[in-house]
């Protein structure tokens, strides 16, 4: 039997598994079965806590999408990861350092229950997103058989494409998201954000996640939208991001500096399941 915890960050829901005290391995097929909301646990992503690969760090953080694919980063998951390792007694620290497949992160538990995450420095170099472009631009043209889109491209440890829209409620997120998430210029696929700017310190956002479809919230997507909006001179240093599942707060001092995300992490229930 595998012991797990169901958690969510603004409705972006996770199955979190302790791989420190349990010996666990998940095949892509098992993950897809567990992710099924009718026949399994049901989740957007599976988060696996592993012992650190580096003695200077506290844990290694792995993320699997509902389709079984392993991905580099998940911001909402990072907040739940921090809450999980404290709740389970895996650490007594309030400041937790973890590695992911794309780098290192610092997670900080606040007294009010929120979690602050140092998401690292946003990556704009196309070759490191990865995105096919000759040079860094504030906006890029993405051509599809249906229409051409104007977007920003950035990596927050995972690739993001952000499109500004006039009305977040009427945009065809599923159709456009499915069209762009596998666009040929993004060799590893891409998460697609749809951003409506309310004012320089406030945006509304919906995100079509690579391998998961539209979710109620996407932490790295919120970070990507805030960073791209600032790089395009449309947003301020501190941005409130309203997602369908709730609100995140993003702080960024600009290029070359780490970006900080603050938001909630909620425990839903503990369970066990036979693989």
Swiss-Prot record:
Specify which residues bind substrate according to the UniProt entry for this protein: 12, 45, 65, 75-76, 158, 191, 209-210, 219-220
Q: Which reaction does it catalyse?
A: (2S,6S)-2,6-diaminopimelate = meso-2,6-diaminopimelate
Broad enzyme group: isomerase
Keyword annotations from UniProtKB, A to Z: Amino-acid biosynthesis, Cytoplasm, Isomerase, Lysine biosynthesis
> In the UniProt record, does the keyword rRNA-binding occur?
no
List GO molecular-function terms, semicolon-separated.
Answer: diaminopimelate epimerase activity
Positions marked as site (Could be important to modulate the pK values of the two catalytic cysteine residues) = 160, 209
One GO BP annotation here? lysine biosynthetic process via diaminopimelate
Q: Which residues form the active site?
A: 74 (proton donor), 218 (proton acceptor)
> Where in the cell does this protein reside?
Cytoplasm
In chain numbering, where does the site feature Important for dimerization fall? 269
**Subunit text:** Homodimer.
Q: Which family does it belong to?
A: Belongs to the diaminopimelate epimerase family.
Spell out the protein name for this chain.
Answer: Diaminopimelate epimerase
UniProt organism field: Shewanella denitrificans (strain OS217 / ATCC BAA-1090 / DSM 15013)
